[in-house]
Amino acid sequence: MKPLSLYHPALYWLRVWQKRLFRHIAWHCSSKRYARPATTSERLPYRYLKHTSKLIRKLGDSDLALQHNKVINLKLAVAAIDGVTIAPGEYFSFCRLVGRPTRQRGYVEGMELSFGEARTGIGGGICQLSNLIHWMAIHSPLVVIERANHSFDPFPDDGRVLPFGSGAAIFYNYIDLVLHNSTDRSFQLKLKVGETQLEGELLCDRERAY
């Protein structure tokens, strides 16, 4: 049986509002220390790992303009997270750092996955950034506390680098990617939207022990 919220748009958005409110309350009442936006351009000295993913991908007869809009959205999301340091004991929340993607903040319509299909939505495409961060996290000592997978793979044959199962869906603010640094080391995310690739580095304050 489908949830009642799926039978009428008003019920759906009421449920979304409720979940967002609950998440804001949880953030406000939590004693967890969350990583804050970077205030300097300094880099931690050691690279722990690096990864990239292709920016423009073809999905059947989909509008490539949505792919180019995705790049605009990614640049805004990258600017919010680039340089953030996750100190020992701290938590990283994608949604807390990026905030709600709205037209007023410069986000445009891109492709997003919803209810098992590709559709347009403001801020669409920023999940590519959460996918990349999640991939780096699972190949590091960072612990994934919260992560939701996408319902299907829109690009099964177009030069996929990140396995589909490694994705991390985002829907502000209650479908989030949350990491925890349970180590005694600091980690830093350095991110960049290049010419053809979304580029990510995970840096550390100590050399990696191989």
State where each predicted segment sits.
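Well-ordered beta-sheet/strand-loop patches within structured domains
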Residues: 1-210
